[in-house]
Amino acid sequence: MMKAEAAGSLPKTNAEAVRKKPGRKRYGWMKGLLLPAVIIAIWQVIGGLGVVSATVLPTPVTIVLTFKELILSGELFGHLQISIYRAALGFLLGAGLGLMIGILAGFSKRTELYLDPSLQMLRTVPHLAVTPLFILWFGFDEVSKILLIALGAFFPVYINTFNGIRGVDAKLFEVARVLEFKWHQQISKVILPAALPNILLGIRLSLGIAWLGLVVAELMGSSSGVGYMIMDARQFSQTNKVFAGIIIFAVVGKLTDSFVRLLERKLLKWRNSYEG
């Protein structure tokens, strides 16, 4: 009798779990807003009480008003448009090359032996170390900025693509041989789908580093862009404008990351992975 009751209660529990799951997914993103909301509230209270000087730490309300001024003057969209153009072009160039060379090195041991040692050495060189060289070689023109961004965007995609291909289970190749897949079918139906999670992770990391590269490029030498706006505001002690620029970088970076995560969910529906 006890077993029958237990067995009868299991479907109900599972049904409740299924009913609750969509709700958790639908409203789960709101939990991520809790910490920023608390920080902003404390920040506003500290600034409002005058604990910290407004020159050092402007209140969130002041920063919002600064955003309003930048939008109405057209300054914000002008700088943001240029920054997005640079970041997008540098990312596409660097990530595209990283994907191509990662695939070549992943499939070919000989290519790996020729290229990987040099690429691993270059990967450890900081952006700030090569920035003076890029300026010396290419000047303060757009080319130096885009190449600097591309350099940072290259390595995450290259490493994750290479590791994704080399991490494919050898048993999948045996299955492909049993099914008499041709070489191009093994690549398109076995290797690349199995390596796709790593490749998408590389793209996410690459986007983040592309934005870091953009900041370095625009802070070191530029007459336009959000980075330039921050540097110009710093010279005139306009801390509220500096914070506005930082928030722009944070928001745009978060939006691009969310887009790639959405792409991951669409392309990796087949993967039954642990979600916590």
Swiss-Prot record:
- Where is the ABC transmembrane type-1 domain positioned along the sequence? 80-260
Q: Does the keyword Transferase apply?
A: no
What Pfam families would the database entry show? BPD_transp_1
Q: What induces it?
A: Repressed by sulfate and cysteine.
Keywords from the named record: Cell membrane, Membrane, Transmembrane, Transmembrane helix, Transport
Enumerate the PROSITE patterns for this protein.
Answer: ABC_TM1
InterPro entries in the record: MetI-like, MetI-like_sf
Record's bilayer topology term: Multi-pass membrane protein
Biological processes annotated in GO = transmembrane transport
Q: Which family does it belong to?
A: Belongs to the binding-protein-dependent transport system permease family. CysTW subfamily.
Q: Per its record, how is this protein called by name?
A: Putative aliphatic sulfonates transport permease protein SsuC
| Species the sequence originates in | Bacillus subtilis (strain 168)
Which gene carries the instructions for this protein? ssuC
